[in-house]
Amino acid sequence: MDDIITLKNILSNDDVNWFLDAMDSIKDPQDRAGSNKLYVPRGELGKQVKLRVIEKIHSLYPDKNIHTVNFYDIVKPYGMHSDTVKFTMQGIIPLEFIDGSAYTLIYHQTSDTNIELVPEDKPEDYKPFFNKGVRDPSTIEGWTPGYKISEKDGQKYWQDKWHYYKEAYKGFSIKHSYEWKIGDIFLFHTKYLHSATCSQSRKKGIMFCLN
């Protein structure tokens, strides 16, 4: 089976609205990267969210369950990282985005450990999320020196911040670009490094991992 999959238009408007209502019902979001918010569904709500997600992907993964699921509201795009808690499939469900086009980028480079790519000019008090640590990019599988992302793609995905990301992501190459469409479910293997882009001002969605 492919390790990057898009299930197009698999969610109805009612499905999307149910998820948005579920997200809004969570009154204790966690702060992430300043203005970003993470909403964790617990108890009966968590069970219902997992059930509704797994129903949509059951035909692809009949023997899998949801290991982790949460909602997020992002205004500051997450940089390149991996979520390799375990080798499995990770999913993204777009729920809403404001202006522009939202993308999730999958890179050719992979990792067998949880990492976050942090530039050398990071602030002294910077602490990577989820204790992923700072990694020398040359230790990442598939990384090689040189610029791999085209100027055209750089301007498209990072816009006026491309001059910064061009250097930060030097040596990395884009394997797949998923453009957010409400109604889709996007899945990819957790081994891949991935990132958001600077092409929209805000987006809401669901992230889940299978066990």
State where each predicted segment sits.
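Non-heme Fe(II)/2-oxoglutarate
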Residues: 1-80, 103-104, 117-147
